[in-house]
Amino acid sequence: MKTVTISKERLRIHIEQLGEIGKTKDKGVQRLALSKEDREATLLVSEWMREAGLTVTHDHFGNLIGRKEGETPSLPSVMIGSHIDSVRNGGKFDGVIGVLAGIEIVHAISEANVVHEHSIEVVAFCEEEGSRFNDGLFGSRGMVGKVKPEDLQKVDDNNVTRYEALKTFGFGIDPDFTHQSIREIGDIKHYFEMHIEQGPYLEKNNYPIGIVSGIAGPSWFKVRLVGEAGHAGTVPMSLRKDPLVGAAEVIKEVETLCMNDPNAPTVGTVGRIAAFPGGSNIIPESVEFTLDIRDIELERRNKIIEKIEEKIKLVSNTRGLEYQIEKNMAAVPVKCSENLINSLKQSCKELEIDAPIIVSGAGHDAMFLAEITEIGMVFVRCRNGISHSPKEWAEIDDILTGTKVLYESIIKHI
């Protein structure tokens, strides 16, 4: 086997340079999917892919794909992926380290002239976060045939549809031809992804990385409660139809339901809430808020969602409100491949790295790729477990460790 060097310095520089695109005033990152910042980042990452020896294309779901052909191109490819879009005012490591690790692995393989039978693909999936169209994991869902026509009609805060955003993004993307970009079982041999943990376990227990055994399935909703607007000073409390108070009742119930079983990893979050018309002296006419419910057990998650829906109906009936529940996305919890878990464990053993087996509470592109191939994931510890924040931070030495482990496993499968 030829000696291969993973460049810590190149990884560090790439992370820093990409972090400058969409940089916010408090040193966070805001690169919403299919935005001008996303386009600028795509151009830069495409350049790095080419430097690593990858041929760059886009599919019609907006996924950026770099491919290095193997000796037998007809064989299924080995894919490494993640995302480069961000949440609003997020951090510079989330998703990014997975894409850049993939590029660095191919860079090292190219520099050492390593011969491989299977082609290697590095993918930056479109809109993993869902922060623009409130509908995440779009690119990976599309790749496995799970995007519906109505998903293309989702609108952002400026009433721009995803279809329009894709159509004008460039790079040959045409949402009228998404059917041409669907992969089938047998097209991809294995899928690997590296990501920051986005939680405190690894740091608390002094592990640089962890091996993921499974991914909790998120379910996203948008709830709208409609009441009756009125003057804040003249409508008695007993006669009000205030949807914001109703929303508060529902939100408190979300917390209660998700904490009922102290041994369960169930989590529920209301991340966005807006009252209309939004005047300080006006009783709101309507309120919209998002719901994010996650669990590693599908049945338990679905039961909690049923109870939340019952609470919404009860509150609405009691307070004289109308309600709408829009289901935006639901992902089934998935387990990582035992084959790839064992491969990653063996790589850790060879490199003398102690890595625990952990569950991912966050959703990742890997969970949809699992529908057509085996998946393997590596987590990198992050400071204080913070993510989706300008305070998000991962040490370059830990990122390097994860990249080396990923390389040692991938090289055995190509």
Curated annotation (Swiss-Prot):
Marked site positions, Necessary for dimerization: 240
InterPro entries xrefs: Amidase_Cbmase, Bact_exopeptidase_dim_dom, Peptidase_M20, Peptidase_M20_dimer
Residues at which a divalent metal cation 1 binds: 83, 94, 195
Superkingdom: Bacteria
GO BP term (any one): amino acid biosynthetic process
Record carries keyword Amino-acid biosynthesis: yes
Binding site for an N-carbamoyl-L-alpha-amino acid: 198, 231, 281, 294, 363
Signal peptide span: none
Stretch list, region Involved in dimerization: 214-333
Catalytic activity: an N-carbamoyl-L-alpha-amino acid + H2O + 2 H(+) = an L-alpha-amino acid + NH4(+) + CO2; N-carbamoyl-L-methionine + H2O + 2 H(+) = L-methionine + NH4(+) + CO2
Positions with a binding annotation for a divalent metal cation 2: 94, 129, 388
GO MF assignments: hydrolase activity, acting on carbon-nitrogen (but not peptide) bonds, in linear amidines; metal ion binding; N-carbamoyl-L-amino-acid hydrolase activity
Function: Catalyzes the hydrolysis of N-carbamoyl-L-alpha-amino acids to free L-alpha-amino acids. Is strictly L-specific since it is inactive toward N-carbamoyl-D-alpha-amino acids.
Subunit composition and interactions: Homodimer.
Entry's family note: Belongs to the peptidase M20 family.
Protein's name in the database: N-carbamoyl-L-amino-acid amidohydrolase
Organism for this UniProt entry: Pseudomonas sp. (strain NS671)
